[in-house]
């Protein structure tokens, strides 16, 4: 669409060469299962998916190596899964000065044993990187550390850790590289919960967040105990 001073160009999954057949099939199924959300998430129409936790993100094709050289600070997180839930490892450049997060890499696979996780980490040249991982899996963390991931560490978990992490992420401008298809999907489907009357609750649904959880872990050193007046999610509907 265009006007006197505005030019808007809409792209959809049909324009993204990075998407695999399985991901495309999922988007096409969304058109049938949830056409209201698919209008935004799949067809690119104006608006937002209702109840989204994060509205502060975009998908942009940036030069990864150049961005790393410019800013210099990369962050990595890991969430563990196996049969139904995936093991994830997102990588991002964090621009602390400008409050921007540039997500450029992702691992998203089910059925990974520790040896296979090590192999995936090696492929990404992250064996020596600091990786903040899910504290609920101390045995897996110990195995990975023993097998060469010397700088993997358990993320801190407390009564407010999820809330603090999400609030901090909401304060950033988040850019996602189009090659990170699972990350894009999660940011487009991670929503707040509702009660039986349809009222929005002050907590997200615990789903579609395997990469998002790992991103929270990766950023934990940048947020601490928040003042009481800030201990709330930012809900904008």
Give, region by region, the residue ranges found by the protein language model.
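ATPase catalytic-site recognition across NTP-hydrolyzing enzymes
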Residues: 16-78
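Hydrophobic/aromatic beta-strand patches that form the interior of the parallel beta-sheet core
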Residues: 7-9, 76, 132
